[in-house]
UniProtKB/Swiss-Prot annotation:
Protein name listed in UniProt: Exodeoxyribonuclease 7 small subunit
Gene Ontology cellular-component terms listed: cytosol; exodeoxyribonuclease VII complex
Protein encoded by which gene: xseB
Subunit structure: Heterooligomer composed of large and small subunits.
Family (UniProt): Belongs to the XseB family.
Organism: Clostridium perfringens (strain 13 / Type A)
EC code: 3.1.11.6
Catalysed reaction, written as an equation: Exonucleolytic cleavage in either 5'- to 3'- or 3'- to 5'-direction to yield nucleoside 5'-phosphates
Amino acid sequence: MARKETNYESMVSELNEIVKQLENGDLTLEESIKSYENGVKIVNKLYKKLSTLEGKIKVVEDEKEEDFGGYSNEY
């Protein structure tokens, strides 16, 4: 079965929900630990996704510089 790719915004939303639940204080200790672990997993996925996107932006910027002969857009 293929794993569904989750987009950045939905992961941030899920992380915000976890934070709200933890801040609310209504979870048991076990539930809090499980939520915290899930939050850490989401943060790691977000970091990985941001790193990947940063690399893509770098490639586009490098290609842009090559297309314009290395000239900067500064005046």
